[in-house]
């Protein structure tokens, strides 16, 4: 795994810096263009300026299989605002220009990658300054065409380590992934209703044995105590999606309140790392 070939440098630098500080990463997820492209940029600014260590960003998609109603709502709002993949790449380029050292990951579905050809998608992502891509509906066993295109464009392929995975799958995830490992705290759809509760220590110790990229715990991370628990269990940090998007949903018509609430939430989650 040569750093000259892949763009995992920003992740490595971020994780190394956090490790030196004895902290973990707080990584929020939002859908690009939710509730509008203009406000989406202000939301991203608010997240970064209040302590987000990296970003996980989605492209709006009308049929998100793995997502609960909160993130589906984000997709629909973004699409209603006219957010296209081209608009998403433009937003990404703006974020990258503003935050040259921030790790930026995409979390999306295979259809969006297939739409204009796999290679063309990764070429655009590279041009926009993207560090990693996680394709939610492509398991590691079927990921070769995506991984090859990603690596050809210096982008880290990210894989999900499911809570019910056997050692063979975890070994494959560890060997195939770069940047970070997305560790699911439970199987199912995203959301904050069921609190993250699967004992992850066992999976974390296996990932460590297999020398996996740093694991970030996601799914159901909605409060600071869960961030602390994830890091205490051995995760390199935590990803929070539905809880962040819920704030956008609640205050979508009141920009000042939305950004203030989001800032408070981000600071509280980061403080728990």
Curated annotation (Swiss-Prot):
Keywords: Amino-acid biosynthesis, Aromatic amino acid biosynthesis, Lyase, Tryptophan biosynthesis. Pathway: Amino-acid biosynthesis; L-tryptophan biosynthesis; L-tryptophan from chorismate: step 5/5. Its EC number is 4.2.1.20. The active site is at residues 56, 67. One of its GO terms (molecular function) is tryptophan synthase activity. GO terms for cellular component: cytosol. It catalyses: (1S,2R)-1-C-(indol-3-yl)glycerol 3-phosphate + L-serine = D-glyceraldehyde 3-phosphate + L-tryptophan + H2O. PROSITE patterns: TRP_SYNTHASE_ALPHA (PS00167). The alpha subunit is responsible for the aldol cleavage of indoleglycerol phosphate to indole and glyceraldehyde 3-phosphate. Belongs to the TrpA family. HAMAP family: Trp_synth_alpha. Tetramer of two alpha and two beta chains. This is Tryptophan synthase alpha chain. The lineage of its organism: Bacteria, Pseudomonadati, Pseudomonadota, Gammaproteobacteria, Alteromonadales. The gene is trpA.
